[in-house]
């Protein structure tokens, strides 16, 4: 299957048994989501060859579809289920027979919470029950579905106020309202911390068992395959490279990722950022005075990769924004060294804070690239960097090489649009977009939030290489201790707005509480 010149899937041959839980494992951009959308059958694909054949049982009287084992049984309308085949490639998108099958397939889309944000949780599920039953509303049915996904305790909450994991479970409850014969789960826990992901996985596992569903789940986390599937597929560049027992497929995927060399001790310079008794307080209607950062004193050295770690709400993002000059402190002092001069970051103006911030860069977790402009445009004109073309091309290639592309890869990437790149490639281009402005201090906010293992290793190498090649100082905000251990020279552990320890990543790890370990260490 192609999108323009890009071949998203090729030579995919796969059979899925009724009642089976199949996992599709692969790095970002390997074609997992595309394959799931093809199997769902509700979108037209212009350049697709081959067949996608469903073997089901269908009632000729009312067109209701059930799994193939129901053939010969009586339908609720009084008819009898007959064996039936539907090929989603040959049947048109609006063909009634194709729609009969596709409406019996539920899907949880990657990073998409299809909820009515202003409605209560129970109303969201009641609406799904109404849609599935053709107009009949059942409060009890909706409540049962919330029980199924362990969300009864949030029944009266407004949907937009739920956490990511809670929203994902409400989405699952809405899909279960269809009483589906198959569930397609596309990275259902890809953006969640390990503890929350476990809750979502348990809800999925329970629903599959209770509803006797066939399930296909995609992930870039090997452990998900082992926990939730009977059989797994390893997908790479749109091709199936291996099928088999989940633990073996997970092992092959980990082997593909390779590893980062042991962190080397690096000579760093003198302090470049210094803060003393730094505090930031907010006023909250329901919580009163919130001490987001509470009397923090800290030094970061030039050329150092320094980690700010802690659970959600510990204060690390607020602290990083103050150190970067984005947020002003309530009290305390921050200074940044420019050359031999110390600049007071609490004094506004081009001769004070502005003198330091022009040498700072920040890559946000939710970074954006201009999707319809080439990579070289994203690295130059789009960010206000006006250079003669030859110099712009040379500087762009040099920066792309710094973040991990080979020179040949960099030359090819320059003319592509971001949507032609994998997630890992886009992340490296976004990092190059920050580095090409020649900052002295770079803040990375949750740089590995949704990354697969292979992409995470690519980005780890990019950070280490950028420090070695360009002499940058990195401040990394993260709750991913695996990543912090791979790249950081030192780290500060934050808890309730305070720094409780500064030292090596291993030293920080030894002082973490059980709750911190559950959120910050991979499962």
Q: Predicted regions span which residues?
A:
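Conserved ABC ATPase signature
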Residues: 158-162, 166, 417-421
């Amino acid at each position: 299957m192609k999108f323009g010149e890009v071949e998203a899937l090729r030579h995919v041959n796969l059979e899925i048994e009724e009642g089976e839980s199949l996992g599709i494992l692969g790095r970002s951009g390997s074609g997992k989501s595309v394959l799931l959308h093809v199997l769902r059958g509700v979108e037209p694909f212009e350049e697709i060859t081959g067949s996608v054949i469903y073997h089901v049982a269908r009632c000729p009287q009312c067109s209701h579809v059930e799994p193939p084992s129901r053939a010969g049984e009586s339908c609720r309308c009084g008819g009898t289920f007959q064996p039936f085949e539907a090929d989603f490639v040959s049947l048109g998108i609006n063909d009634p027979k194709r729609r009969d099958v596709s409406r019996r397939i539920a899907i949880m889309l990657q990073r998409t919470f299809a909820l009515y944000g202003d409605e209560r949780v129970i109303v969201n599920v009641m609406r799904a029950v109404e849609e599935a039953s053709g107009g009949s509303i059942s409060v009890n049915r909706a409540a049962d579905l919330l029980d199924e996904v362990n969300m009864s305790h949030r029944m009266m909450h407004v949907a937009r106020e739920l956490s990511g994991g809670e929203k994902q479970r409400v989405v699952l409850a809405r899909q279960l309202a269809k009483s589906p014969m198959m569930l397609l789960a596309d990275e259902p826990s890809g953006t969640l911390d390990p503890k929350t992901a476990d809750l979502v996985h348990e809800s999925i596992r329970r629903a599959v068992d209770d509803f006797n569903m066939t399930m296909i789940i995609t992930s870039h986390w090997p452990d998900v395959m082992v926990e939730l599937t009977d059989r797994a597929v390893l997908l790479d560049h749109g091709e199936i490279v291996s099928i088999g027992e989940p633990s073996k497929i997970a092992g092959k995927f980990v082997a593909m990722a390779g590893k980062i060399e042991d962190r080397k001790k690096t000579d760093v310079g003198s302090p470049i950022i210094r803060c003393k008794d730094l505090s930031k307080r907010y006023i909250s209607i329901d919580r009163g005075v919130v001490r987001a950062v509470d009397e923090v004193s800290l030094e970061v050295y030039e050329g150092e990769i320094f980690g700010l770690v802690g659970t959600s709400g510990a204060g690390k993002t607020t602290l990083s924004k103050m150190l970067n000059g984005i947020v002003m402190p309530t009290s305390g002092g921050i200074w940044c060294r420019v050359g031999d001069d110390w600049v007071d970051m609490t004094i506004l103006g081009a001769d004070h804070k502005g003198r330091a911030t022009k040498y700072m860069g920040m890559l946000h977790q939710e970074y954006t690239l201009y999707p319809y402009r080439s990579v070289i445009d994203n690295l130059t004109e789009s960010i206000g960097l006006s250079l003669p073309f030859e110099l712009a091309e040379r500087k762009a290639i040099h920066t792309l090489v710094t973040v991990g592309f080979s020179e040949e890869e960099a030359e090819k990437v320059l003319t592509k649009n971001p949507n032609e790149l994998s997630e890992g490639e886009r992340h490296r281009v976004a990092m190059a977009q920050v580095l090409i402005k020649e900052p002295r201090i770079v803040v990375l906010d949750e740089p590995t939030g949704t990354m697969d293992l292979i992409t995470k290793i690519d980005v780890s190498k990019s950070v280490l290489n950028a420090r070695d090649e360009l002499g940058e100082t990195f401040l990394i905000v993260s709750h991913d201790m695996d990543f912090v251990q791979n790249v950081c020279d030192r780290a500060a552990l934050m808890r309730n707005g305070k720094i409780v320890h500064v030292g090596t990543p291993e030293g920080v790890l030894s002082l973490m509480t059980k709750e911190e370990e559950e959120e910050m260490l991979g499962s």
